[in-house]
């Protein structure tokens, strides 16, 4: 039996690099997204952005707020497309309860980290996060610089 050709490249649609810098990430979850047809087409074209995105809870459901998916020009024109509409996150009841408990604690929030393809479905990686103070961000930057410097010194010693 012949194997199917797999597409080369990454399955990642969009990353939220800002979240890793602005927040201290704790527990991570994988959630599905309830999307319409034009949104899936736009994501296949790489038109998604989750930089300023966050998760809210309404009626014991999780919703992705301020996620931007730009419509394609060739998308259907007989209905209005809203690039910033709220999108429902598909999670188990146990996971939603765990996330809501964390948000009710002081200083915690839920932020999306990545959008990616898993098989033929769009998945969103979300994390329970706590906001960093300015001095925490500076410390993270110092640690990152020190790791780079260590790598540089190690490579120089190898020569």
From Swiss-Prot:
NCBIfam families, per the entry:
PRK05422.1, smpB
Q: Which GO terms describe its cellular component?
A: cytosol
Tell me if Cell wall biogenesis/degradation is a UniProt keyword of this record.
no
Q: Which UniProt keywords apply?
A: Cytoplasm, RNA-binding
Q: Name one Pfam family in it.
A: SmpB
Source taxonomy: Bacteria, Pseudomonadati, Pseudomonadota, Gammaproteobacteria, Cellvibrionales
One Gene Ontology biological process = trans-translation
Protein encoded by which gene: smpB
| UniProt name for this protein | SsrA-binding protein
Q: Which HAMAP family match?
A: SmpB
